[in-house]
């Protein structure tokens, strides 16, 4: 009996040591795994950040992956032009050349088959080129803040010949500029600085935000993306709410949420290139009537940054790490993400008492 007890005790001790080793190993693994949650309103550039991580840390897009983006890019180009043409009547803008009215009819007749096949026929290419070149369409494009038009419209429409070529293969820049509405939860894993990152992107539309709660568990850091250039635009969902106001409300709810007391909060003030171009034409006061500064990129960008950072109600214990970004610029995102990773590592060490 005594021997049997001793044997059982030894086995129990061995089992306990195995469990302890497993727990230590699991604890170390969890410390090396960084869960990054990408949040922000629709059109803030979250999905482009995910693509950049694939380019920078996961080998990029091979030939087959590039080819898979062709139908989406064709759709983006066609959709942009059809939005412009539809907006002409609403904005009371006429074609400069009356013949373009027939081309507009042809555009709507030809787009369905083109989108389903993922290719632009020579006939459709001619129609699209003539419409896009018309001064009336260009005037309508210049007023795109008055209707919904993606940022990539001019990029694709200025390069229709290349995109419509039968042997067209999207470039990395084409892919970065492509736009597809994120629905559900998209995860991307990669390794950097001996850490395993799990980047989670969830849709920014109002209808998608109810899914965010499912991603909150175990979050190491949040990257909140802001569309700097959206200060004069309305939400796609209701065409009334200011995109910037919606972004500020959303950031307030995330920044001051009890879920994220010990979570690093990184603010990506994105689309700085578009803000730099737009601020020369449209004053920041259309969004912030109290703004009295110059309509320059430098002053406007800092003012917007302050609006977000001032929402932090726990400044003594919680720091916001802000970066101005251009999500389509790989070198910029690579530099910023390197700095972000260092902050995350330091904050993790502080949290576990090693710093």
From Swiss-Prot:
What SMART domains does the record tag this protein with?
G_alpha
Question: What is the membrane topology noted in the UniProt record heading this document?
Answer: Lipid-anchor
Renumbered to this chain, region (G2 motif) spans: 174-182
Q: Which GO BP annotation is one of this protein's?
A: adenylate cyclase-inhibiting G protein-coupled receptor signaling pathway
**Keyword annotations from UniProtKB, A to Z:** GTP-binding, Lipoprotein, Magnesium, Membrane, Metal-binding, Myristate, Nucleotide-binding, Palmitate, Transducer
User: Residues bearing covalent lipid (N-myristoyl glycine)?
Assistant: 2
Domain of life, per UniProt, equals Eukaryota
Q: Which residue ranges are recorded for the region named G4 motif?
A: 266-273
| Binding residues annotated for GTP, in chain numbering | 40-47, 176-182, 201-205, 270-273, 327
**UniProt keyword Protein biosynthesis present:** no
State the residue spans of region: G3 motif.
197-206
GO MF, any single term: metal ion binding
Cite the record's Basic and acidic residues compositional bias ranges.
Answer: 1-14
Residues annotated as binding Mg(2+): 47, 182
Q: Which PROSITE patterns does UniProt cross-reference here?
A: G_ALPHA
Task: Give the region (G5 motif) as residue ranges.
Answer: 325-330
Sites of S-palmitoyl cysteine lipidation: 3
InterPro entries cross-referenced by the UniProt entry: Gprotein_alpha_I, Gprotein_alpha_su, GproteinA_insert, P-loop_NTPase
Subcellular location as annotated: Membrane
The function of this protein is: Guanine nucleotide-binding proteins (G proteins) are involved as modulators or transducers in various transmembrane signaling systems.
Family as reported in the entry's similarity comment: Belongs to the G-alpha family. G(i/o/t/z) subfamily.
Protein name, entry field: Guanine nucleotide-binding protein G(z) subunit alpha
Q: Which gene encodes it?
A: Gnaz
